[in-house]
Every structure is written in structure tokens, then in C-alpha cells.
């Protein structure tokens, strides 16, 4: 019998790094509404009283960077200085340039199917049958806890909650199967006048218990709610935030490998983002078809080259056919060239702000979660 623990974390939409991700993707969406051929690499930095937006953007669109930034922060819930950040009074600074023509000549082609990758890179996708979402349980439930915190805050059910929060869930496995939840950590920013006793009871009763399945909670499950005892100072006042610093939260919670490339603020010509979505799409369809219980796929690209340089698949000894046979199937069914995967997944649309919080994967509203290749794979 082989028992082990595995832990994943998530953060709320009010976490500083997630504020940055959302601003970058909000700007990307507004640009794509006007210009589907735009090249966008938008980075955001937030700290007390200020937002700095930089990067490279080449587009025919005009967007009001300041207005979009303030609206995004306001929608998150930072509407006055009491929470440590104010959408209406913070400074918004812009240092945006254009995409290098050296890069552009490797991407744009007269024949779009020959569109080259926007950069070199290694990309991973993953799926598992351990949850209904074909996602690992630790990251799934860490996200659900954060979504519940946001829901209760925005509906004023727990009006003393503030936007910044973090969760961490540790599952116990036996031979790859979940047997229990070992530990739950949840820290949430709050108003100053709330007692710790009341906060802990409310978080347990209103956030944790409604989200986590009873079948995995035992008398030995440990709960740590605001373990420092106080979380009043949060958001950008507590820590600076930068686009792309929560890449494990954005993907599989550490259950799968990661190529290192972040997602937010990048248009689909950047394979860091678009090929990661395609890799998830491939892995999920393989698992849903019954060809494997778990599947990880690696793709690699070279700048300016259309075809992937390599494809690797690992099914962790759960595959019904060999990994090499799976790779052959993938090559015949999925178009993994940059333009091919953009078209396959309909990525040229303004859907990216929604991806910037609570994970890019395991959410049915996104096209890379479709299971429309299951029959072809079966």
C-alpha cells in the first residue's frame, strides 16, 4: 500500500498577482474586440496606490488603458482605500511599446496555415479522471474555495470579507486513489472589527463545509483558518503584484509539469498560451475517451516554425494503447500548428479576462474543455 499527500493552492481575484493578470487580460479582450490580428504581450505591476502597464502591443485598435484598468480593479472590489487599494484614486502609468519587427516577420505569413510560432517554448497539458472536471482534486477544490469566498463577499452574505484571499488543500492518496482530505488552509482578508472566533466559525460554516465533499473529510482532517490571527492589510498594500506569477495556480496545481510560460496578457499567437490550451484539449479528450486514466502531453515549438518540434505523451501506465500509438493518433486528429490550433479552438475572441482567475482549465465555458474529439479517438 502506497500512501502519499499532495497539496495545491489557489488565490482569489483580489490577490495582487491576480489583479495584474486580470488587468492584462482585460486589455487583451478590449483589443481583440476591435482587432483580431493584434499582437499583444501586456504586463502589469501593481503596488500601493499605483498600476504600471508595459509590454509590446501592435494593433489598429484604440483602447482607453486607464479606464479599463480602473474598471477591472473596481469589479474586483477595491473601491476605497479601506481595503488597501482604490480603483478611483490609484495612479495608472503606461509604458507600452510595439512588437519587434524581427519577431513579426517570423509569425505573419501570406498563407495563415504557415503562421510560425511567436516564440520557442515547451508546453504541457494534463488531464485525469479523478474528478468530473478531468482535473486533479487538490487544485479543483482550492479554486472552489476561492470562488465561494468571492461569491459570499460580493453578495454581502459575509460583508466583512475583503478581496484578498488564499486557499490550500492537501489530499491523501492510496495507490493513486483519493482516500481523504488531510489539511485545509484558508486565509482571507477581513475588516478590522471582526473577531477571530467569529471569522473562523463563519469561514468554516459558509465557505469550507459547503464546498468540500463530506466523504473526504474525517476526524483527522486539519483546518487552519487565518492562522496568523489577522489579515487586515492585503492586496497591493500588503504585496506587489505582477502578471504571470501564478502559473501553477493557473494550470494543474503542480500535479503536472510546467514549461514556464505564463498566459495572461498574451494574444493567441503566443504558443505559451494557445498551445497550452491545445495540450489540455488533447489530454482531456484522451482521458474522456477511455484511452488513459491520466495523460500528460508535452509540445515544443521554434520561433517562426509552424509545426511542433516534438510531441511527447505519458499516461503513467494507465494507457490502453502505447504512448507512441497515442502520439500517432494525436498527429492525425489535432492540428497543432499555431494557426491550426487557434482555428480549432476558436481562440480569436475576447474570452481571456474570465480565464485570469480560478484556473484556466476544468471550466466548461472554455472551448479547450470541449470533448468533441472523443469519438475520433475511441
UniProtKB/Swiss-Prot annotation:
Indicate the enzyme's highest-level EC class.
transferase
This entry carries the following GO cellular component terms, namely:
cytoplasm
Could you say which EC number(s) this protein's record lists? 2.5.1.6
Cite the binding residues for L-methionine. Answer: 56, 99, 239, 270
Catalyses which reaction(s): L-methionine + ATP + H2O = S-adenosyl-L-methionine + phosphate + diphosphate
Per the UniProt entry, what is one GO biological process? S-adenosylmethionine biosynthetic process
- Leader sequence range is none
Q: Does the keyword Nucleotide-binding apply?
A: yes
Q: Which family does it belong to?
A: Belongs to the AdoMet synthase family.
Instruction: Quote the function comment for this protein.
Output: Catalyzes the formation of S-adenosylmethionine (AdoMet) from methionine and ATP. The overall synthetic reaction is composed of two sequential steps, AdoMet formation and the subsequent tripolyphosphate hydrolysis which occurs prior to release of AdoMet from the enzyme.
Q: Which protein, by its recorded name, is this?
A: S-adenosylmethionine synthase
**Gene that codes for this?**
metK
